[in-house]
């Protein structure tokens, strides 16, 4: 019995062992299957659509499957085929560095590998900072190609491949030198599966552990439902907020049929993905045909559902469609870039990664929204508000969620929150714990946002964890995209949101508005209006419209009607327009009365703010906007013998092609703008129906509606660029006038020459087609935007016969220092093109015979893209195309600043398309030369063949030079012996900041525009040269007054000319520094028929301590015709100045503007309004003056003006 019992126990033990082994094997198989499915889903979301599923790395049985796939993470770069990961290290933040390049994963060599390089990897992967940068294949040897070697990161790059390196696949390494990284976010045990992984399995509870980095959730474009296998994404649309709609269902991504698909359905998608609202709901496979199952059909959303699959539909996998009917969405937050970004990019940001789809727990999205900053431990959300776009503001900081105090909390702060979370704009900024009291730390207090910041924590505040608040003061936000489920609409709602009700001006009964209060406008053109327009707008309105159009375009803004409560300084109800340029926003104007002015942005963004106070109400305003390309030019072509000049078919240049204008709505006012823009006088006729023949290019504009006062054709209202319903049989034309013909030169004063800075235009000899004067010496300087070239065309040349008497000279740059391209004489014609962005035309006549003269037009076109040079205030930026270098046999790494190869400051930024050097004027070997009031900064770039006995390719030398106040050669290439030399010289600008001040103390700048003043009031001006070079000085050469903003020759009054004071009230003040000048004069106006006065001041830039410079010579008397070149002057136009009038109907706060100094003291301080002006750049700043009588200045030849 004892032996039997022992045998029985042994058998039972063997049975248990076998059972355990079997169970373990089955579990491992299940785990492997699950891992394979997860990897497949990962790769499916990380590859561009053109790659078939069979080609996806995650679907192959490759060696990567044995290298702990659970702990591998990838971060993508800007190129579609670049990604980064750490493998074989035990968790996602340590391991061997691998890069996905051209479809294959490869390693990085450890030559020069250090913690600077490792820091870039850790930051890119959202893994904190580098703890260690081990080499020698510390995490095992890789199997793919060795992609990068000799990396020399500074530690601040966004992507590892942005660091200087020896070139892709250029190395001298083996896999035994594979580089690795250990980041601060690495797990400290490789045997434990990290907590965040548990949310990816079906059997585990979906809890977010503290180990999930802050950036994980807000950057994904998938939105999960309560079922583990449901998620949403947009693919193949170029960015994360537009594309084909795809749903993850039962482990596979599928499409949605476009039957009944409309903006209500699309709105649900955009809201669910945090992409704003629906701009469009395209069907018919607009973003390409999908390849998976068609999951949903006949969707009938109301637009308020939380998830797309919550809408009524025909059932999962029930449809009668094909993939040619796949539905798409374009959301308001979609990028406006034409660059195609692969599908996998949509789930991440450039500096972080989030490869998660179904792993996000369902409860995360419906009630909270997070938005991550670049720091791994910062995020933002709204909680306890009923949906993702309203609630208590909470910030994730150092691993814990905390609240924000409501001290100084307002809609500017709330706007930043709403924009950061993709929730539209701020409807309200409630405090006092409106959404309940939080329980975590109070992280921020005294926030003072401008409303334009990208992140809430970028706003000025009192410091992290620094406050004097309790949780009863927790701040909240209600955004425009918040659900309208609340049963009680608060009173403040009616004046601040595009809701269903609105305050009526005389009763508490709400009236329906005709337009919302603020919003984001992303169309190429559009309209908007004040709340309830044309009804009365509400009191205490604060509306902000943010307009953003395609990159490379600018914005025009005009007003159809404007009726606000009027005040001379617009302090009650007003509209303010801001020019949103990179890194700053500048006020273009503050208005409260109707104006025909067109406001134009410098870049592709503009902000319009409307504010009303607590009393008087008016109908408000109706505004329109459109956009136009920055490189637009204008010309007339195909004129006939009846109209030899200033007539023809209207054509516009944009994007490398000339296109026509449709004649729909084309009239004399439109033609007037064309004639003025080209310097062709007034419009005589505006023929349509292809009067000058049909064009062959694109039809660029249609439905043009000019008022006749615009400065360019594209400032006029139109249908949008390349949007039309026309054919070339409807091409528009113009016939312009010319001044009256005279046979003898007039005995009156004349002006010739000047500075032309438009992209295209025209000019002519004095009195053309009347006879030009004797002894003329006229110089026209033409400067267009950087890296463009100028082409001038002479259409009619009637000069004295023989080139030794009267002639025209064309210079490739400023005429005193540049090569002569041609001398044009009687009867000649043709066109000439500069090698840079600057050209000078000089016209000379002798003492005898005169004739009709000439007229010419010019236009600009882009120069070669192989090399570019930009001259900025404190450094130059030289860019060279990598394809150009490759064509010469060099790689991007071969190009250096000789002698400065190892200085970090002097190393280039290398991308796949160009090599860019940022070269300071004060270092990296830059040479400064001062000559004749001109400062030239020069340096060189070199790519040389390695030393050896023989060589088979030329050395490359590139000379770069910025001549401040002089000219440029760009992309002039010539061969010299065995060296290929490229000389780049760029014409640069000095910037001058000029402002009006309220008194001689120069403490308070004047902000209002126009600037209303009393007759004979002292006007104080300060101009400052903005440049880092302390050896420069500024001098006021000439200031001329005119009643016209663009004409300073017909009727003028001199304040100071050539340094000689002409007006007895002009007075200069001592200079606080050589770069600042101050002066004053008394206000006046030109007779009673001219209500405004404009000033044109010419500022001269000199060497500060040069006794022979122009700044030291003071008053200089010189001949009128000795115009020389304007290259040392900065021209600034100021105006209009208008007489201050009192408004009797205004409240008792109005007082006569007797002493602006006292007003300044009472108000504390004024905001500054300064306008920067480059060389020859005409900048309009509002100022003002008026008249009641007149006074003659006949002795000086000055026009009649009034000062008493």
From Swiss-Prot:
May play roles in mucosal defense system and cellular immune defense. May play a role in liver regeneration. May be an important factor in fate decision and differentiation of transit-amplifying ductular (oval) cells within the hepatic lineage. May function as a binding protein in saliva for the regulation of taste sensation. May play a role as an opsonin receptor for SFTPD and SPAR in macrophage tissues throughout the body, including epithelial cells lining the gastrointestinal tract. Required for terminal differentiation of columnar epithelial cells during early embryogenesis. This is Scavenger receptor cysteine-rich domain-containing protein DMBT1. Residues 517-628, 752-861 form the CUB domain. The SRCR domains mediate binding to bacteria. InterPro entries: CUB_dom, Sperma_CUB_dom_sf, SRCR, SRCR-like_dom_sf, ZP-C, ZP-C_dom, ZP-N, ZP_dom. The keyword tRNA processing does not apply. Keywords: Cytoplasmic vesicle, Developmental protein, Differentiation, Disulfide bond, Glycoprotein, Membrane, Protein transport, Repeat, Secreted, Signal, Transmembrane, Transmembrane helix, Transport. It comes from the Eukaryota. One of its GO terms (molecular function) is zymogen binding. Residues 870-1118 form the ZP domain. Disulfide bonds join 109-173, 122-183, 153-163, 257-321, 270-331, 301-311, 405-469, 418-479, 449-459, 517-543, 570-592, 662-726, 675-736, 706-716, 752-778, 803-825, 1039-1097. Its main location: secreted. It comes from Sus scrofa. Residues 84-184, 232-332, 380-480, 634-737 form the SRCR domain. SUPFAM superfamilies: Spermadhesin, CUB domain, SRCR-like. Residues 1-19 form the signal peptide. The lineage of its organism: Eukaryota, Metazoa, Chordata, Craniata, Vertebrata. Glycans are attached at residues 585, 593, 640, 749, 932, 977, 993, 1029. GO terms for biological process: cell differentiation; defense response to Gram-negative bacterium; defense response to Gram-positive bacterium; protein transport. Gene3D superfamilies: Spermadhesin, CUB domain, SRCR-like domain, Zona pellucida, ZP-C domain, Zona pellucida, ZP-N domain. Highly N- and O-glycosylated. The O-glycans are heavily sulfated. The chain crosses the membrane at residues 1168-1188. It is a single-pass membrane protein.
